Regions:
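S-adenosylmethionine-dependent methyltransferases
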Residues: 1-203
């Protein structure tokens, strides 16, 4: 199952609200925006978020440089995972109302990141509805030996444990996992990098 085809089917419902966590340069959000343009989106909002001021400034510049059609809007916003989930009031209205699709690439590099992200998703990812039966968080991470412990936290934090969660109506769990093997950036013959692709949603 390709990531592109999966995202396309999920994005082809309008209006559509998308959120990127740890956007960095904004490459993923801009690629999603182009995908939305290609399928004729007339009402799509993409919010690309990051924490570091210097990264956000570069993100804003990249968004401004990439002209998009009127039907697709990309904005950049500050988001601190470690504080957002327990804030009494959502300070920025852009985060109100929930998101249909959330995605993140290479954003797990500390032991608490998965926990913080799950807590944020519990407030930000839309609950299942007739219009959007399966809101999803798409996560891709490189499987680095140096970050094996941090990577393992994803399946621990988003585990489907029926005994613990049976009394809760909606719980975020890993619904799909795929290992993707790519050639390494070094260009050396035979050198490859493995990525884990997760689809996380409400049980």
């Amino acid at each position: 199952m390709g990531i592109d085809s999966t995202l396309t089917s999920e994005l082809d419902i309008f209006p559509c609200r998308c959120l990127e966590l740890g956007a960095g340069t904004g490459l993923v959000s801009l690629a999603v925006a182009k995908m939305l343009e290609s399928i004729g989106s007339t009402d799509a909002d993409i919010v690309a978020t990051d924490y570091y001021p210097s990264v956000l400034e570069n993100l804003r510049r990249n968004v401004t440089r990439n002209l998009l059609s009127e039907g697709v809007c990309v904005t950049s916003k500050f988001l601190d995972w470690s504080t957002f989930y327990h804030a009494d009031i959502i300070a920025d209205p852009v985060f109100e109302g929930g998101f249909d699709v959330v995605y993140g690439a290479d954003i797990i590099y500390e032991a608490l990141h998965a926990t913080w992200i799950k807590s944020c998703l519990e407030r930000l990812l839309c609950k299942p509805s007739t219009r959007r039966p399966d809101p999803t968080f798409h996560l891709v991470i490189p499987l680095r030996a140096t970050h094996a412990v941090e990577s393992s936290t994803i399946e621990m934090v988003f585990r489907d444990d029926g005994e613990i969660y049976e009394q809760q109506e909606h719980v975020l769990v890993v619904k799909y996992k795929e290992i993707i093997v790519c050639d390494a950036e070094s260009g050396k013959d035979g050198e490859e990098v493995e990525y884990a692709y997760y689809k996380i949603g409400w049980s």
